[in-house]
Amino acid sequence: MIGASLAKKGQLTIVGSGIASISHLTLQAVSAIENADIVCYVVADGATEAFIRKKNPNSLDLYHLYGEDKQRTDTYIQMAEFMLIRVRQGQNVVGVFYGHPGVFVCPTHRALYIARSEGYKARMLPGLSAEDCLFADLGIDPSSVGCVTYEATDLLVFKRPINPASHLVLYQVGIVGKSNFKFDYTSDENIHFTKLLDRLEEAYGPEHSVTHYIAPLFPTEDPIAEEYTIAQLRLPEIRDKIHTISTFYVPPKTSESLIYDEVLLASLGVTHKPSVPYPWNPEATPYGPREKKAIELLAEHEPPKGYRPLKERSGLLAVLEKLCLEPLEMKKYNEDRQAYADGLKGLTENEKEALVKGDHRTLAGALKVGDTPTNPAALVFTFIITRLD
Protein backbone atom coordinates (compact mmCIF):
# COMPACT_ATOMS: atom_id res chain seq x y z
CA MET A 1 0.00 0.00 0.00
CA ILE A 2 2.84 2.43 0.78
CA GLY A 3 4.44 1.83 -2.60
CA ALA A 4 1.12 2.27 -4.35
CA SER A 5 0.39 5.55 -2.56
CA LEU A 6 3.72 7.03 -3.67
CA ALA A 7 3.04 6.08 -7.30
CA LYS A 8 0.20 8.60 -7.62
CA LYS A 9 0.79 12.32 -7.53
CA GLY A 10 -2.35 13.57 -5.81
CA GLN A 11 -2.50 13.64 -2.03
CA LEU A 12 -4.94 14.56 0.71
CA THR A 13 -4.21 16.13 4.09
CA ILE A 14 -7.02 16.73 6.58
CA VAL A 15 -6.46 19.29 9.36
CA GLY A 16 -8.57 20.80 12.13
CA SER A 17 -9.20 24.48 12.74
CA GLY A 18 -9.95 23.86 16.41
CA ILE A 19 -12.74 25.63 18.27
CA ALA A 20 -11.35 29.10 19.03
CA SER A 21 -11.12 31.39 16.01
CA ILE A 22 -7.68 31.27 14.30
CA SER A 23 -5.73 30.63 17.52
CA HIS A 24 -6.41 26.88 17.61
CA LEU A 25 -4.86 26.26 14.20
CA THR A 26 -1.60 24.39 14.82
CA LEU A 27 1.69 25.35 13.17
CA GLN A 28 1.51 22.03 11.34
CA ALA A 29 -1.98 22.81 10.03
CA VAL A 30 -0.98 26.31 8.87
CA SER A 31 2.05 24.90 7.07
CA ALA A 32 -0.15 22.37 5.28
CA ILE A 33 -2.58 25.11 4.23
CA GLU A 34 0.20 27.34 2.91
CA ASN A 35 1.72 24.56 0.82
CA ALA A 36 -1.49 23.11 -0.64
CA ASP A 37 -2.52 23.38 -4.28
CA ILE A 38 -6.08 23.86 -3.09
CA VAL A 39 -7.73 24.18 0.33
CA CYS A 40 -11.30 23.00 0.97
CA TYR A 41 -12.73 24.13 4.29
CA VAL A 42 -15.74 23.99 6.61
CA VAL A 43 -15.07 26.28 9.56
CA ALA A 44 -17.20 27.99 12.18
CA ASP A 45 -16.40 31.67 11.75
CA GLY A 46 -15.47 34.31 9.22
CA ALA A 47 -12.19 35.27 10.88
CA THR A 48 -10.82 31.74 10.50
CA GLU A 49 -12.15 31.61 6.95
CA ALA A 50 -10.37 34.86 6.07
CA PHE A 51 -7.16 33.64 7.73
CA ILE A 52 -7.21 30.47 5.61
CA ARG A 53 -7.75 32.52 2.44
CA LYS A 54 -4.89 34.80 3.46
CA LYS A 55 -2.56 31.83 3.86
CA ASN A 56 -3.72 30.26 0.58
CA PRO A 57 -5.86 32.28 -1.87
CA ASN A 58 -6.86 29.10 -3.70
CA SER A 59 -9.36 28.12 -1.01
CA LEU A 60 -12.95 26.93 -1.39
CA ASP A 61 -15.76 26.91 1.18
CA LEU A 62 -17.58 23.56 1.35
CA TYR A 63 -20.28 24.92 3.64
CA HIS A 64 -22.34 25.76 0.55
CA LEU A 65 -22.93 22.03 0.05
CA TYR A 66 -25.33 21.99 3.00
CA GLY A 67 -29.00 22.44 2.20
CA GLU A 68 -32.22 22.49 4.18
CA ASP A 69 -33.77 20.07 1.68
CA LYS A 70 -30.92 17.54 2.05
CA GLN A 71 -29.98 14.88 4.55
CA ARG A 72 -26.68 15.65 6.24
CA THR A 73 -25.28 12.29 5.12
CA ASP A 74 -25.73 13.29 1.46
CA THR A 75 -23.89 16.54 2.12
CA TYR A 76 -21.00 14.68 3.75
CA ILE A 77 -20.71 12.33 0.76
CA GLN A 78 -20.50 15.38 -1.51
CA MET A 79 -17.90 17.11 0.67
CA ALA A 80 -15.67 14.05 0.54
CA GLU A 81 -16.07 13.69 -3.22
CA PHE A 82 -15.37 17.40 -3.77
CA MET A 83 -11.91 16.85 -2.28
CA LEU A 84 -11.35 13.46 -3.92
CA ILE A 85 -12.03 14.80 -7.42
CA ARG A 86 -9.12 17.20 -7.00
CA VAL A 87 -6.87 14.55 -5.49
CA ARG A 88 -7.50 12.39 -8.55
CA GLN A 89 -6.49 15.36 -10.71
CA GLY A 90 -3.05 15.14 -9.10
CA GLN A 91 -3.43 18.07 -6.72
CA ASN A 92 -2.14 18.43 -3.17
CA VAL A 93 -5.48 18.93 -1.40
CA VAL A 94 -5.90 20.13 2.18
CA GLY A 95 -9.25 19.87 3.92
CA VAL A 96 -9.80 22.10 6.95
CA PHE A 97 -12.63 21.14 9.28
CA TYR A 98 -13.92 22.75 12.46
CA GLY A 99 -12.62 21.30 15.74
CA HIS A 100 -10.65 18.06 15.55
CA PRO A 101 -11.09 16.84 11.97
CA GLY A 102 -11.64 13.25 13.06
CA VAL A 103 -13.97 13.78 16.02
CA PHE A 104 -17.67 13.70 15.10
CA VAL A 105 -16.76 14.47 11.49
CA CYS A 106 -17.96 12.08 8.78
CA PRO A 107 -16.65 13.42 5.41
CA THR A 108 -13.02 13.47 6.51
CA HIS A 109 -12.91 9.77 7.37
CA ARG A 110 -14.76 8.88 4.16
CA ALA A 111 -12.37 10.92 2.00
CA LEU A 112 -9.26 9.51 3.69
CA TYR A 113 -10.43 5.92 3.41
CA ILE A 114 -11.29 6.24 -0.29
CA ALA A 115 -8.09 8.13 -1.13
CA ARG A 116 -5.94 5.47 0.53
CA SER A 117 -7.89 2.63 -1.09
CA GLU A 118 -7.24 4.23 -4.50
CA GLY A 119 -3.51 4.44 -3.82
CA TYR A 120 -3.14 8.10 -2.88
CA LYS A 121 -1.15 9.43 0.04
CA ALA A 122 -3.62 10.62 2.68
CA ARG A 123 -3.26 11.61 6.31
CA MET A 124 -5.05 13.43 9.10
CA LEU A 125 -3.41 15.95 11.44
CA PRO A 126 -4.87 16.36 14.95
CA GLY A 127 -6.76 19.43 16.08
CA LEU A 128 -8.50 20.70 19.22
CA SER A 129 -12.03 19.44 19.83
CA ALA A 130 -14.84 20.80 21.99
CA GLU A 131 -13.99 18.04 24.45
CA ASP A 132 -10.40 19.29 24.75
CA CYS A 133 -11.75 22.75 25.58
CA LEU A 134 -14.20 21.25 28.07
CA PHE A 135 -11.44 19.37 29.88
CA ALA A 136 -9.44 22.60 30.18
CA ASP A 137 -12.27 24.93 31.18
CA LEU A 138 -13.93 22.55 33.65
CA GLY A 139 -10.68 21.20 35.08
CA ILE A 140 -11.33 17.56 34.23
CA ASP A 141 -8.77 14.83 33.71
CA PRO A 142 -10.48 11.93 31.90
CA SER A 143 -7.95 9.48 33.30
CA SER A 144 -8.98 10.15 36.90
CA VAL A 145 -11.98 7.80 36.78
CA GLY A 146 -12.27 7.13 33.06
CA CYS A 147 -14.39 8.99 30.52
CA VAL A 148 -17.02 8.00 27.96
CA THR A 149 -18.02 10.27 25.06
CA TYR A 150 -21.24 9.83 23.09
CA GLU A 151 -23.22 11.68 20.50
CA ALA A 152 -26.58 12.29 22.19
CA THR A 153 -28.79 10.65 19.56
CA ASP A 154 -26.40 7.71 19.23
CA LEU A 155 -26.63 7.16 22.99
CA LEU A 156 -30.40 6.79 22.73
CA VAL A 157 -30.79 4.92 19.45
CA PHE A 158 -28.22 2.23 20.18
CA LYS A 159 -28.87 2.03 23.93
CA ARG A 160 -25.22 2.71 24.73
CA PRO A 161 -24.20 1.78 28.28
CA ILE A 162 -23.67 4.53 30.85
CA ASN A 163 -21.16 4.02 33.65
CA PRO A 164 -22.17 6.39 36.49
CA ALA A 165 -18.74 5.94 38.09
CA SER A 166 -16.97 7.66 35.15
CA HIS A 167 -17.07 11.05 33.45
CA LEU A 168 -19.64 11.33 30.63
CA VAL A 169 -19.45 13.84 27.76
CA LEU A 170 -22.39 14.24 25.37
CA TYR A 171 -22.14 16.01 22.02
CA GLN A 172 -24.99 17.53 19.97
CA VAL A 173 -27.48 17.71 22.83
CA GLY A 174 -29.20 20.60 21.06
CA ILE A 175 -30.30 18.55 18.04
CA VAL A 176 -31.41 15.25 19.54
CA GLY A 177 -32.87 12.96 16.89
CA LYS A 178 -32.21 15.38 14.00
CA SER A 179 -30.74 14.05 10.74
CA ASN A 180 -31.61 17.01 8.53
CA PHE A 181 -29.82 20.36 8.32
CA LYS A 182 -30.99 23.90 8.95
CA PHE A 183 -28.99 27.09 8.75
CA ASP A 184 -30.75 28.39 11.84
CA TYR A 185 -32.02 25.87 14.37
CA THR A 186 -34.01 27.22 17.32
CA SER A 187 -34.18 25.62 20.75
CA ASP A 188 -37.91 24.89 20.44
CA GLU A 189 -37.12 22.50 17.58
CA ASN A 190 -35.18 20.23 19.94
CA ILE A 191 -38.39 18.30 20.58
CA HIS A 192 -36.70 15.02 21.51
CA PHE A 193 -34.53 16.59 24.21
CA THR A 194 -36.69 15.15 27.00
CA LYS A 195 -35.87 11.65 25.76
CA LEU A 196 -32.22 12.37 26.53
CA LEU A 197 -33.14 13.65 29.99
CA ASP A 198 -35.19 10.50 30.62
CA ARG A 199 -32.13 8.38 29.82
CA LEU A 200 -29.88 10.43 32.09
CA GLU A 201 -32.41 10.41 34.92
CA GLU A 202 -32.66 6.63 34.66
CA ALA A 203 -28.89 6.35 35.16
CA TYR A 204 -28.25 9.16 37.65
CA GLY A 205 -31.52 10.28 39.22
CA PRO A 206 -33.26 13.68 38.85
CA GLU A 207 -31.02 15.58 41.27
CA HIS A 208 -27.68 14.68 39.70
CA SER A 209 -25.83 17.65 38.22
CA VAL A 210 -25.07 18.26 34.55
CA THR A 211 -22.82 21.03 33.23
CA HIS A 212 -24.04 22.78 30.09
CA TYR A 213 -20.86 23.78 28.26
CA ILE A 214 -20.09 25.92 25.20
CA ALA A 215 -16.47 26.64 24.31
CA PRO A 216 -15.67 30.26 23.39
CA LEU A 217 -15.23 30.93 19.68
CA PHE A 218 -13.74 34.42 19.84
CA PRO A 219 -11.22 35.90 22.31
CA THR A 220 -13.92 38.39 23.33
CA GLU A 221 -15.98 35.57 24.86
CA ASP A 222 -15.79 33.48 28.00
CA PRO A 223 -16.72 29.80 28.13
CA ILE A 224 -20.28 28.98 29.15
CA ALA A 225 -20.33 26.48 32.00
CA GLU A 226 -23.75 26.33 33.67
CA GLU A 227 -24.53 23.64 36.22
CA TYR A 228 -28.08 22.30 36.49
CA THR A 229 -29.75 19.23 37.88
CA ILE A 230 -31.33 16.86 35.40
CA ALA A 231 -34.71 17.94 36.76
CA GLN A 232 -33.91 21.63 36.15
CA LEU A 233 -33.04 20.92 32.51
CA ARG A 234 -36.71 20.09 31.96
CA LEU A 235 -37.74 23.67 32.77
CA PRO A 236 -38.52 25.67 29.59
CA GLU A 237 -36.36 28.64 30.59
CA ILE A 238 -33.37 26.31 31.10
CA ARG A 239 -34.06 24.09 28.10
CA ASP A 240 -34.10 27.16 25.84
CA LYS A 241 -30.42 27.78 26.67
CA ILE A 242 -29.37 24.55 24.96
CA HIS A 243 -28.02 25.24 21.45
CA THR A 244 -26.64 23.24 18.54
CA ILE A 245 -23.08 23.80 19.78
CA SER A 246 -23.88 22.84 23.38
CA THR A 247 -22.07 19.96 25.06
CA PHE A 248 -23.05 18.24 28.30
CA TYR A 249 -20.61 17.09 30.96
CA VAL A 250 -22.03 14.64 33.49
CA PRO A 251 -19.76 14.04 36.51
CA PRO A 252 -19.53 10.62 38.15
CA LYS A 253 -21.83 9.83 41.03
CA THR A 254 -19.79 10.32 44.20
CA SER A 255 -21.79 7.56 45.86
CA GLU A 256 -20.35 5.02 43.44
CA SER A 257 -17.74 2.99 45.32
CA LEU A 258 -14.60 1.73 43.62
CA ILE A 259 -14.34 -2.01 43.13
CA TYR A 260 -10.85 -3.38 43.57
CA ASP A 261 -9.39 -6.54 42.10
CA GLU A 262 -7.75 -7.82 45.28
CA VAL A 263 -6.02 -10.72 43.52
CA LEU A 264 -4.51 -8.47 40.86
CA LEU A 265 -3.33 -5.92 43.45
CA ALA A 266 -1.56 -8.69 45.34
CA SER A 267 0.10 -9.91 42.13
CA LEU A 268 1.37 -6.35 41.55
CA GLY A 269 2.87 -6.28 45.02
CA VAL A 270 0.51 -3.52 46.19
CA THR A 271 -0.44 -3.98 49.82
CA HIS A 272 -2.71 -0.93 50.22
CA LYS A 273 -5.93 0.03 48.48
CA PRO A 274 -5.41 2.62 45.71
CA SER A 275 -7.14 5.97 46.15
CA VAL A 276 -8.37 8.74 43.91
CA PRO A 277 -6.10 11.81 44.34
CA TYR A 278 -7.05 15.43 44.94
CA PRO A 279 -8.83 17.28 43.32
CA TRP A 280 -10.97 14.40 41.99
CA ASN A 281 -11.48 12.92 45.42
CA PRO A 282 -13.75 15.29 47.40
CA GLU A 283 -12.56 13.72 50.66
CA ALA A 284 -8.88 14.43 49.94
CA THR A 285 -7.12 17.65 50.94
CA PRO A 286 -4.65 19.58 48.77
CA TYR A 287 -2.07 19.78 51.56
CA GLY A 288 -2.14 16.60 53.60
CA PRO A 289 0.91 15.07 55.34
CA ARG A 290 2.21 13.46 52.15
CA GLU A 291 1.85 16.65 50.11
CA LYS A 292 3.58 18.74 52.78
CA LYS A 293 6.52 16.33 52.92
CA ALA A 294 6.93 16.36 49.12
CA ILE A 295 6.89 20.17 49.11
CA GLU A 296 9.51 20.36 51.87
CA LEU A 297 11.85 18.17 49.80
CA LEU A 298 11.49 20.52 46.81
CA ALA A 299 13.90 23.07 48.33
CA GLU A 300 16.79 20.57 48.41
CA HIS A 301 16.04 18.82 45.12
CA GLU A 302 18.84 18.29 42.62
CA PRO A 303 18.49 16.85 39.09
CA PRO A 304 18.93 13.06 39.24
CA LYS A 305 21.69 11.15 37.48
CA GLY A 306 19.40 10.04 34.63
CA TYR A 307 18.34 13.59 33.73
CA ARG A 308 19.88 14.92 30.50
CA PRO A 309 19.49 18.64 29.72
CA LEU A 310 19.14 20.09 26.24
CA LYS A 311 22.40 21.00 24.51
CA GLU A 312 23.17 24.71 24.63
CA ARG A 313 24.09 24.60 20.94
CA SER A 314 22.95 22.12 18.31
CA GLY A 315 22.63 22.57 14.56
CA LEU A 316 20.12 19.73 14.59
CA LEU A 317 17.52 21.90 16.34
CA ALA A 318 17.18 24.28 13.38
CA VAL A 319 17.02 21.36 10.95
CA LEU A 320 14.21 19.66 12.85
CA GLU A 321 12.29 22.93 13.06
CA LYS A 322 12.40 23.23 9.26
CA LEU A 323 11.35 19.61 8.80
CA CYS A 324 8.41 20.15 11.14
CA LEU A 325 7.16 23.33 9.48
CA GLU A 326 8.17 23.11 5.82
CA PRO A 327 6.68 20.24 3.78
CA LEU A 328 9.03 20.86 0.83
CA GLU A 329 12.03 20.47 3.14
CA MET A 330 10.55 17.22 4.41
CA LYS A 331 10.13 16.04 0.83
CA LYS A 332 13.84 16.64 0.14
CA TYR A 333 14.72 14.70 3.29
CA ASN A 334 12.55 11.73 2.30
CA GLU A 335 14.02 11.56 -1.21
CA ASP A 336 17.51 10.79 0.11
CA ARG A 337 18.19 11.06 3.83
CA GLN A 338 21.93 10.53 3.56
CA ALA A 339 22.39 13.12 0.81
CA TYR A 340 20.23 15.56 2.73
CA ALA A 341 22.28 15.16 5.93
CA ASP A 342 25.60 15.35 4.05
CA GLY A 343 24.54 18.65 2.51
CA LEU A 344 23.98 20.33 5.86
CA LYS A 345 26.55 22.39 7.72
CA GLY A 346 26.99 22.73 11.46
CA LEU A 347 26.03 19.16 12.43
CA THR A 348 28.19 16.77 14.39
CA GLU A 349 28.67 13.25 13.03
CA ASN A 350 26.36 11.93 15.74
CA GLU A 351 23.69 14.45 14.75
CA LYS A 352 24.01 13.52 11.07
CA GLU A 353 23.74 9.85 11.93
CA ALA A 354 20.64 10.53 14.04
CA LEU A 355 19.06 12.53 11.22
CA VAL A 356 19.61 9.75 8.70
CA LYS A 357 18.23 7.15 11.08
CA GLY A 358 15.26 9.35 11.90
CA ASP A 359 13.75 7.45 14.84
CA HIS A 360 12.63 9.30 17.95
CA ARG A 361 15.09 7.61 20.34
CA THR A 362 18.15 8.60 18.33
CA LEU A 363 16.95 12.10 17.45
CA ALA A 364 15.82 12.90 20.99
CA GLY A 365 19.15 11.65 22.34
CA ALA A 366 21.17 13.71 19.84
CA LEU A 367 19.52 16.89 21.12
CA LYS A 368 20.51 16.17 24.70
CA VAL A 369 23.85 16.31 26.45
CA GLY A 370 25.60 12.97 25.97
CA ASP A 371 24.41 12.25 22.41
CA THR A 372 23.27 8.73 23.31
CA PRO A 373 19.81 7.43 22.31
CA THR A 374 17.03 8.21 24.77
CA ASN A 375 15.40 5.40 26.68
CA PRO A 376 11.78 5.09 25.42
CA ALA A 377 10.56 5.21 29.01
CA ALA A 378 12.00 8.73 29.31
CA LEU A 379 9.76 9.88 26.45
CA VAL A 380 6.59 8.98 28.31
CA PHE A 381 5.47 11.70 30.69
CA THR A 382 2.82 10.41 33.08
CA PHE A 383 1.47 13.34 35.04
CA ILE A 384 -1.49 11.55 36.58
CA ILE A 385 -0.93 9.65 39.82
CA THR A 386 -1.26 5.94 39.10
CA ARG A 387 -2.95 5.35 42.46
CA LEU A 388 -0.50 2.52 43.06
CA ASP A 389 2.25 4.58 44.71
UniProtKB/Swiss-Prot annotation:
Residues 1-253 are annotated as: Methyltransferase domain. GO terms for biological process: methylation. Pathway: Secondary metabolite biosynthesis. Keywords: Methylation, Methyltransferase, S-adenosyl-L-methionine, Transferase. CmiMA automethylates at Leu-379, Phe-381, Thr-382, Phe-383, Ile-384 and Ile-385 before being processed by a prolyloligopeptidase which likely forms a peptidyl ester upon removal of the follower propeptide, which then undergoes macrocyclization with the N-terminus of the modified core peptide. Peptide backbone alpha-N-methylations change the physicochemical properties of amide bonds to provide structural constraints and other favorable characteristics including biological membrane permeability to peptides. GO terms for molecular function: methyltransferase activity. The modification N-methylisoleucine is found at residues 384-385. Residues 371-376 are annotated as: Precursor leader. InterPro entries: 4pyrrol_Mease, 4pyrrol_Methylase_sf, 4pyrrole_Mease_sub1. Its EC number is 2.1.1.-. The active site is at 72, 76, 98. The modification N-methylphenylalanine is found at residues 381, 383. Residues 254-370 are annotated as: Clasp domain. It holds the Pfam family TP_methylase. S-adenosyl-L-methionine binds at residues 98, 100, 103, 130, 172, 215, 246-247. The modification N-methylthreonine is found at residue 382. The modification N-methylleucine is found at residue 379. In the N-terminal section; belongs to the precorrin methyltransferase family. Fusion protein of the methyltransferase cmiM and a type I borosin core peptide; part of the gene cluster that mediates the biosynthesis of a type I borosin, a highly methylated cyclic peptide with potent biological activities. Type I borosins derive from the C-terminus of the fusion protein, and it is the same protein that methylates its own C-terminus using S-adenosyl methionine (SAM). The C-terminus is subsequently cleaved off and macrocyclized by a prolyloligopeptidase to give the final product. Within the homodimer, the clasp domain wraps around the adjacent subunit to position the core peptide into the other subunit's active site for iterative intermolecular methylation. Homodimer. This is Methyltransferase/ribosomally synthesized type I borosin cyclic peptide precursor cmiMA. It comes from Coprinellus micaceus. The gene is cmiMA.
